């Protein structure tokens, strides 16, 4: 067998390949069969992870800004707009450690009008999964699934979500290969109890037992081997958010008893995310935390910066950090702040991340992954 890199021992060549930044994966794979097999091997990614070479990325389904879209967006150049006249959504990437922003390649063959409105996003391994939402050209609910592979640099279609086309459902992944979906509402505005799981590698959906309660506009997080579905409301109480949650044990394949006091009544669960040691959420003025000790009390841990208090979108980052993207006023540009871990007894500090104008649009969904 030929060496990976002529003139170098294979162990040295592998060390070189593992240091290629993720945007270069596609080019490296195209060099030769040996390099492609090397990058596709589990050992390659284990070496990267073990050597601290992985990169933390935040993927954001974000609207394009009118002032910048004309110069940077193929979607805008093709004049693809939602029927409402709003700017199209695309997938933006942010590296919190370097502060750099970028776009994922567009998928004109699969998503000619941009990302679906109100879609959900989840990360599994080196793939990013986009699920459901509304067709931007018709506002019809979609059951489509699209997958971006960071290794190949390509988009592909996944198996569509089975059952009634649902909107505003809970969604989360185990970060490995499975995406969970639950609740939402059907085309008749009926809140749903049904749930299912999607195996990304097999491209297969499997039904899960129904939840105990109907949950429209609920939030999904994955923590401690369980898919936690928080809040939402029933058909009869439309728009009146409840405070309970229930969790699906992925190993035992059953739902836990309903936790009746997961949230304060009337609080939208959109900003609820799972951190290293518990759950975070954003109120109108603070970030609150609920630990894993079993207590139901939410405690304020930091005041929310005024620049991100409107329509905040929260993302838990490795190392006990929390990223919040939001605006100071309706229709205003979105800012980005990162809440750093506690340093002794001092208040947890915020670090403001620079946001270029073209990445200051509204964020409708987000997730964190490591490549």
Model-derived regions: residue spans:
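Kelch-like beta-propeller repeat domains
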Residues: 1-371
């Amino acid at each position: 067998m030929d060496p990976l890199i002529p003139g170098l021992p294979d162990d040295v060549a592998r060390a070189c390949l593992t240091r290629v930044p993720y945007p270069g994966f596609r080019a490296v794979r195209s060099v030769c069969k040996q390099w492609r097999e090397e990058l596709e091997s589990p050992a390659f990614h284990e070496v990267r992870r073990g050597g601290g070479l992985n990169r933390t990325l935040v993927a954001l389904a974000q609207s394009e800004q009118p002032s910048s879209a004309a110069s940077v967006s193929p979607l805008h150049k093709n004049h693809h707009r939602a029927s409402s006249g709003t700017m199209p959504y695309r997938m933006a990437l942010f590296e919190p450690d370097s502060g750099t922003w970028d776009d994922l390649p567009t998928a004109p063959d699969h998503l000619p009008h941009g990302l679906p409105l109100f879609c959900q996003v989840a990360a599994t391994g080196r793939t990013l999964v986009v699920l459901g939402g509304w067709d931007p050209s018709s506002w019809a609910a979609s059951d489509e699934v699209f997958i971006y592979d960071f290794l190949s640099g390509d988009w592909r279609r996944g198996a569509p979500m089975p059952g009634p086309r649902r909107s505003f459902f809970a969604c989360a992944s185990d970060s490995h290969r499975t995406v969970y979906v639950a609740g939402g509402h059907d085309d008749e505005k009926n809140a749903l109890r049904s749930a299912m799981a999607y195996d990304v590698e097999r491209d297969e959906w499997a039904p899960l037992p129904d939840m105990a309660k109907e949950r429209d506009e609920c939030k999904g997080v994955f923590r401690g081997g369980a898919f936690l579905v928080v809040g939402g409301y029933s058909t009869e109480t439309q728009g009146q958010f409840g405070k309970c949650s229930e969790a699906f044990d992925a190993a035992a394949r059953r739902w836990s008893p309903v936790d009746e006091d997961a949230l304060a009544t009337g609080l939208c669960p959109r900003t609820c995310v799972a951190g290293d040691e518990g759950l975070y959420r954003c109120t109108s003025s603070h970030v609150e935390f609920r630990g894993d000790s079993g207590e139901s009390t939410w405690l304020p841990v930091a005041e929310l910066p005024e620049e991100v208090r409107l329509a905040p979108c929260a993302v838990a980052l490795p190392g006990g950090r929390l990223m919040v993207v939001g605006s100071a006023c309706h229709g205003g540009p979105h800012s980005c702040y990162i809440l750093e871990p506690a340093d002794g007894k001092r208040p947890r500090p915020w670090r403001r991340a620079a946001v270029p104008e073209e990445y200051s649009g509204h964020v409708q969904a987000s997730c964190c992954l490591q490549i």
